[in-house]
C-alpha cells in the first residue's frame, strides 16, 4: 500500500501543476519580486505563485485514503490538520499579495496569531482529546536525558511550529531550493519514523516526498511556478509537528539545518543593522548573499541541497541512536 500512496501523491501533483499554471496566469496571480534583490530575479516577475496548492491537494487526498486503510491512523489525522491549517494561512497571505500586486500580505501580527491558534489547537487535539500520545519532555540526544517541560511544552510547540513554518518560508527564495530541501528532510523523517516504530508518520512522510517530487520539475530553475506561502508555511509546520510527534524535536535543527541558517541570517542582519547601522551580509536570507557574491542560482541551490543532505543524515543518525 505504501507504494500505492506514493504513486497517487506523485501523479496528483504532477497532473495538477500544468492545469493550475495557465489558470493562475489567466487570473494574473503572479509573484512580485523585491526591487533590491539580485537583478537576475527581475525576470521572474509575474511567475505564477500559490503552486503549493497542488501538492497540498495531493497530500490531503492521499492522506484521506491512507486514513481509511492504515491502522492507528491518528498521527496522519493530526498531520493533516496541521497541513490544512498552515496551508490556509499561507493561501490567505498569497491571495492578498497577488490581489494587491505587491509583496505585502497578512501583517506579521495577523500571521503570527493565526499560526499560534493552529499550534494550540494541535496541542489540544493531541493532549486533551488523546488523538496521539507524546511526552511533554524535551529529549536531549546522546546524553539519554529528558527535560520535563510540563505545561511549558505548549509554549515550546507554538515556538517550534511557528518558527519552522516561517523558516521554510524564508528559504523559499530560489527556484527549487525549499522543495528539494523538504524532500530531503521528509526522507530522513520517513526512515526515522520506521526505525522508531511510528509507521503512520512514516507513511505521511512518504506521501509528502512524492507529492513534492511531482511539483519539483515545475519548480526547478527556471521555475514555471512558485509554491508561495501556501506551500512553504505548510511545509515548515509539518516538519515541526513530525519532530514533536516523534519526540525528536532537536533533530530538526540538523535535518532542517539550512532552514535554520537562513532564518538566523535574517535575524542577525536585522539585529546588526538596528544596533550598528551595518549589514553583515550583502543581503538576507543568506542565499541572496551568495548570489550577490557571484554564485549562480543553480550553484547556490545545489550546494545548499548538499549541505541539507549531509546534515540531514547526521540528524537521522542522532535521532535513532
Swiss-Prot record:
GO terms for biological process: cell division; cell wall organization; peptidoglycan biosynthetic process; regulation of cell shape. Keywords: Cell cycle, Cell division, Cell membrane, Cell shape, Cell wall biogenesis/degradation, Magnesium, Membrane, Metal-binding, Peptidoglycan synthesis, Transferase, Transmembrane, Transmembrane helix. GO terms for cellular component: plasma membrane. Its cofactor is Mg(2+). Its main location: membrane. Signal peptide: none annotated. Its EC number is 2.7.8.13. It is a multi-pass membrane protein. One of its GO terms (molecular function) is metal ion binding. It catalyses: UDP-N-acetyl-alpha-D-muramoyl-L-alanyl-gamma-D-glutamyl-L-lysyl-D-alanyl-D-alanine + di-trans,octa-cis-undecaprenyl phosphate = Mur2Ac(oyl-L-Ala-gamma-D-Glu-L-Lys-D-Ala-D-Ala)-di-trans,octa-cis-undecaprenyl diphosphate + UMP. It is found in: Cell membrane. Disulfide bonds: none annotated. The keyword Lipid metabolism does not apply. Pathway: Cell wall biogenesis; peptidoglycan biosynthesis. It holds the Pfam family Glycos_transf_4. The keyword Membrane applies. The chain crosses the membrane at residues 1-21, 50-70, 76-96, 112-132, 140-160, 176-196, 200-220, 225-245, 250-270, 300-320. Belongs to the glycosyltransferase 4 family. MraY subfamily. PANTHER family: PHOSPHO-N-ACETYLMURAMOYL-PENTAPEPTIDE-TRANSFERASE, PHOSPHO-N-ACETYLMURAMOYL-PENTAPEPTIDE-TRANSFERASE HOMOLOG. Catalyzes the initial step of the lipid cycle reactions in the biosynthesis of the cell wall peptidoglycan: transfers peptidoglycan precursor phospho-MurNAc-pentapeptide from UDP-MurNAc-pentapeptide onto the lipid carrier undecaprenyl phosphate, yielding undecaprenyl-pyrophosphoryl-MurNAc-pentapeptide, known as lipid I. This is Phospho-N-acetylmuramoyl-pentapeptide-transferase. It comes from Staphylococcus epidermidis (strain ATCC 35984 / DSM 28319 / BCRC 17069 / CCUG 31568 / BM 3577 / RP62A). The lineage of its organism: Bacteria, Bacillati, Bacillota, Bacilli, Bacillales.
Amino acid at each position: 500500500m505504501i507504494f500505492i500512496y506514493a504513486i497517487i501523491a506523485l501523479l496528483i501533483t504532477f497532473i495538477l501543476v500544468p492545469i493550475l499554471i495557465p489558470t493562475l496566469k489567466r487570473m494574473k496571480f503572479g509573484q512580485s519580486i523585491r526591487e533590491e534583490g539580485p537583478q537576475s530575479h527581475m525576470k521572474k516577475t509575474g511567475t505564477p505563485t500559490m503552486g503549493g496548492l497542488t501538492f497540498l491537494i495531493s497530500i490531503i487526498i492521499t492522506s484521506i485514503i491512507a486514513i481509511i486503510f492504515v491502522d492507528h491512523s491518528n498521527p496522519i489525522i493530526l498531520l493533516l490538520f496541521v497541513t490544512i491549517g498552515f496551508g490556509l494561512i499561507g493561501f490567505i497571505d498569497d491571495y492578498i499579495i497577488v490581489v494587491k500586486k505587491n509583496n505585502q500580505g497578512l501583517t506579521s501580527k495577523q500571521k503570527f496569531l493565526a499560526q499560534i491558534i493552529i499550534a494550540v489547537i494541535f496541542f489540544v487535539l493531541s493532549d486533551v482529546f488523546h488523538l496521539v500520545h507524546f511526552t511533554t519532555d524535551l529529549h536531549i540526544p546522546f546524553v539519554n536525558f529528558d527535560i520535563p517541560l510540563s505545561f511549558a511544552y505548549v509554549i515550546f510547540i507554538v515556538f517550534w511550529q511557528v518558527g519552522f513554518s516561517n523558516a521554510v518560508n524564508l528559504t523559499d527564495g530560489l527556484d527549487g531550493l525549499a522543495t528539494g530541501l523538504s524532500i530531503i528532510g521528509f526522507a530522513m523523517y520517513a526512515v526515522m519514523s520506521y526505525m522508531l516504530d511510528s509507521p503512520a508518520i512514516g507513511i505521511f512522510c512518504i506521501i509528502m516526498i512524492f507529492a513534492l517530487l511531482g511539483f519539483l520539475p515545475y519548480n526547478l530553475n527556471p521555475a514555471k511556478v512558485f509554491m508561495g506561502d501556501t506551500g512553504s508555511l505548510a511545509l515548515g509546520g509539518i516538519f515541526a509537528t513530525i519532530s514533536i510527534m516523534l519526540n525528536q524535536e532537536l533533530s530538526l535543527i540538523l535535518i532542517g539545518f539550512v532552514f535554520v541558517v537562513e532564518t538566523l541570517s535574517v535575524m542577525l542582519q536585522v539585529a546588526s543593522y538596528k544596533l550598528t547601522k551595518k549589514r553583515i551580509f550583502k543581503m538576507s536570507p543568506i542565499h541572496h548573499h551568495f548570489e550577490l557574491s557571484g554564485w549562480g542560482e543553480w550553484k547556490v541551490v545545489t550546494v545548499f541541497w548538499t549541505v541539507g543532505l549531509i546534515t540531514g543524515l547526521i540528524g537521522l543518525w542522532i535521532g535513532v541512536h
